[in-house]
A protein has these predicted regions:
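Glycine-enriched, solvent-exposed interface loops adjoining structured elements
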Residues: 1-99, 106, 178, 183-187, ...
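Extracellular glycan-recognition surfaces and repeat-rich motifs
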Residues: 103-127, 253
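Beta-strand acidic-aromatic groove motif in beta-rich domains, primarily in extracellular
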Residues: 157-168
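Extra-cytoplasmic beta-strand recognition segments
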Residues: 101, 132-157, 191-195, 220-222
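Extracellular beta-strand ligand-recognition surfaces/modules
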Residues: 192-222
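Extracellular carbohydrate recognition and processing domains
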Residues: 171-201
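Extracellular beta-rich ligand/substrate-recognition surface
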Residues: 123-133, 184, 294
Length: 313
């Protein structure tokens, strides 16, 4: 858990012990003498702490990497220090943007009815529809099968169905036309369905046609049907050179397939996967230890938990 103590607080803790004039947010940039030196001392102390050990638990984070068909190697994030190669998983890329509604309903276009469409902060964030519809277009591959998952809650226990439509235009039903009704009120209901794309652009439409109740959509998820999450096996670069590089370097797509292994590149700035990926819809999830950023503004905080902040000052 990251700390909450600001750079300004840390500086003033030191200045107070030295019986020096403390800074405020308005005087922070105009620091002088011992005040400026204290700024530098704190950053030096933080640097010493973070460089004493590479794998501090509070610097452990995760990221995702979109995969491109035929592309073998990828670079680590800018703040990367060391990767946990036991954490690399290959999954199907999530195609819906902001389908979790964590803080807003951005990326969704509403279709007016007699009611409204709005953001609800209930749960982890939801799209609230009351006699309103919302849709989003996603990129798809013609004739490719996809999984769609939708969770909805009925705030007034009215038993009103949510229309879920998938097609080549907003409210289109060429690929899927179904409803989702909540019967276990308070628990919600989940739709698990599949569809086959008939266009490179596919529209997902959610529609509550009644003002009798709010239908709260908790999440919408779409991914390719035939991609099963797989842990990537780590192999050393030496083993990659000795074992499979001859296959990957052949200028032919015949050997493109679902990647099974991951290796660290020789410069330690990235990773490679093998076999070469056969599609663009894969995504790699992995964890790594990041490098810290020096404190600079008054409101900057440490990655270090507050309980350990006295180590710095």
């Amino acid at each position: 858990m990251a700390g909450t103590k600001t750079y300004l607080t840390l500086i003033n803790n030191v200045l107070r012990e030295l019986n020096e004039v403390e800074l405020t947010s308005s005087t922070f940039s105009a620091s002088r003498g011992i005040q400026t030196a204290t700024k530098d001392f704190i950053n030096k102390a933080v640097n010493d702490l973070y460089t004493a050990e590479v794998q501090w638990p509070w610097l452990y984070t995760s990221t995702t990497q979109d995969v491109n068909s035929g592309q073998q190697e990828y670079t680590f994030p800018t703040a990367f220090r060391v990767a946990d190669f036991e954490s690399f998983y290959l999954i199907s890329k999530e195609l819906v943007t902001n389908g979790e509604f964590t803080s807003n309903i951005n990326s969704w276009t509403t279709i007016a009815g007699a009611g409204s469409a709005s953001y609800s902060s209930n749960g982890n964030g939801r799209l609230r529809l009351n006699d309103y519809a919302a849709h989003q277009s996603i990129s798809t591959v013609v004739n490719q099968s996809y999984r769609i998952q939708v969770r909805v809650l009925d705030s007034n226990s009215a038993g009103q169905p949510l229309k879920v439509q998938v097609g080549t235009a907003a409210e289109g039903t060429q690929n899927l036309n179904t409803t989702l009704t909540v019967s276990d009120f308070g628990k919600g209901a989940i739709l698990d369905a599949t569809f086959t794309a008939t266009s490179q652009t596919t529209f997902i439409t959610l529609n509550n046609t009644s003002t009798a109740t709010n239908l709260d959509v908790d999440f919408v998820r779409v991914s390719e049907k035939d991609v099963v999450p797989t842990k990537l096996q780590f192999i050393s670069y030496a083993n990659y050179l000795q074992g499979v590089i001859h296959r990957d370097k052949v200028n032919s797509s015949d050997h493109y397939a679902k990647p099974k292994s991951v290796y660290r590149t020789q410069d330690n700035l990235g990773f490679g996967i093998t076999p070469l990926p056969d599609r663009d819809s894969y995504q790699i999830n992995y964890q790594y230890y990041k490098s810290h950023t020096e404190l600079s503004s008054a409101t900057d905080t440490l990655d270090l938990p507050d309980i350990y902040s006295d180590v710095v000052v």
